[in-house]
């Protein structure tokens, strides 16, 4: 690995430790040429998961799309950015744990709704209205009835 200060290619590891979530190793290195220290991170390469859309098109899974959808659904609601990121992280982790190469966008949408329902019911209804393409007020009322019953 090249030193970011002098581009020398040899270094020694001074310290190694796992990050809090145990998915990455943080290493402190010292350049054998200029003796400056720098940090590197080592992570297992993820296998890309493809999302199968309604029209059967495929695209790489993108956690940011989940975060953006949640931000819109949670606007002006008491849901923090951290809660939104936690939901997206939990969904990403759940998909990764399935060890699949493809997942239907429908399944991801259902996961988002399940998590969002536990955090804020208004945000859940907002997300569901877009995701399930509510056609009229009766569809909203039906979803709210289901929410109250459960």
Curated annotation (Swiss-Prot):
GO biological process, one term: negative regulation of DNA-templated transcription
Cofactor note: Binds 1 zinc ion.
Database matches in InterPro entries: ATP-cone_dom, NrdR-like_N, RNR_NrdR-like
Residues in unnamed zinc fingers: 3-34
Domain ATP-cone: 49-139
Source organism, top-level taxon: Bacteria
Keyword rRNA-binding part of the UniProt annotation: no
Keywords assigned by UniProt, alphabetized: ATP-binding, DNA-binding, Metal-binding, Nucleotide-binding, Repressor, Transcription, Transcription regulation, Zinc, Zinc-finger
Cofactor(s), names only, from the UniProt record: Zn(2+)
GO terms assigned for molecular function: ATP binding; DNA binding; zinc ion binding
Similarity comment: Belongs to the NrdR family.
PANTHER family listed in its UniProt record: TRANSCRIPTIONAL REPRESSOR NRDR
Function: Negatively regulates transcription of bacterial ribonucleotide reductase nrd genes and operons by binding to NrdR-boxes.
Stated name of the protein: Transcriptional repressor NrdR
Organism: Clostridium botulinum (strain Eklund 17B / Type B)
Name of encoding gene: nrdR
């Amino acid at each position: 690995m090249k030193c970011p200060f002098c581009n020398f290619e040899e270094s020694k590891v001074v310290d190694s430790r796992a990050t809090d979530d145990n998915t990455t190793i943080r290493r402190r290195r010292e350049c054998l040429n200029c003796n400056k220290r720098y940090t590197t991170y080592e992570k297992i390469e993820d296998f890309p998961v493809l999302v199968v859309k309604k029209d059967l098109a495929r695209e790489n899974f993108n956690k940011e799309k989940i975060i953006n959808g949640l931000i819109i659904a949670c606007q002006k609601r008491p849901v923090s950015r951290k809660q939104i990121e936690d939901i997206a992280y939990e969904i990403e982790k759940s998909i990764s744990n399935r060890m699949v190469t493809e997942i239907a966008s429908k399944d991801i949408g259902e996961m988002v709704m399940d998590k969002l329902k536990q955090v804020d019911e208004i945000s859940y209804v907002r997300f569901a209205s877009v995701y399930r393409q509510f056609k009229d007020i009766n569809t909203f009322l039906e979803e709210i009835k289901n929410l109250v019953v459960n």
